[in-house]
């Protein structure tokens, strides 16, 4: 199995502060160019069953889905969860370079919030954001679910920049051969 950073790495040009979207978000202290790494998610790889047990114990945590039935979960004992996290936007300023690396989708200006569309790494059909989206984008979906990656508008917006396992699923969908893994 691939190894991941024990903790999330965040570009030093990023700072955590209050966000109009939700809680504390990640903001550019200095400009960040399109394609530059914003953060690399670290943590513990967990199966669906392990992740379900984890969710039953912890309410506040950061996690991303990295493959079918596999999640990368920051250890709440060592994470900066209270500091903040990357907020969702339906027109995100970052996208996936691989299953754990978020890069700038476009140039980020000083003071701009770095955001990610959770559809880029979430496929759990039973998952839904615990509040209505407040991203303010003209593309706002309002209700954010684990099935949003299947929407054609979302697939077009982020073409080939989802987590690799979702890119593979989308390719299978386009070929008409997706079977739930």
Regions found by a protein language model. Name each.
Residues 2-97:
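Catalytic cores of histone-lysine modification enzymes
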């Amino acid at each position: 199995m691939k190894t991941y950073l024990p903790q999330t790495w965040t570009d030093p040009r990023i700072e955590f502060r209050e966000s109009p979207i939700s809680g504390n978000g990640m903001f550019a202290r200095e400009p960040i160019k399109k394609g530059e790494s914003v953060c690399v998610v670290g943590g513990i790889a967990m199966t669906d069953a392990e992740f379900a047990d984890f969710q039953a114990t912890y309410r506040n945590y950061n996690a991303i889905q990295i493959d079918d039935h596999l999640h990368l979960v920051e250890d709440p004992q060592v994470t900066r969860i209270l500091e903040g996290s990357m907020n969702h936007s339906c027109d995100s300023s970052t996208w996936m370079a691989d299953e754990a690396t978020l890069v700038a989708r476009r140039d980020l200006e000083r003071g701009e919030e770095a955001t990610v569309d959770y559809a880029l790494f979430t496929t759990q059909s039973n998952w839904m954001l615990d509040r209505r989206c407040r991203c303010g984008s003209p593309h706002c979906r309002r209700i954010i679910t684990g099935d949003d990656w299947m929407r054609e508008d979302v697939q077009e917006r982020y073409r080939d920049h989802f987590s690799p396992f979702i890119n593979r699923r989308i390719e299978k969908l386009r070929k008409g051969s997706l079977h739930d893994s």
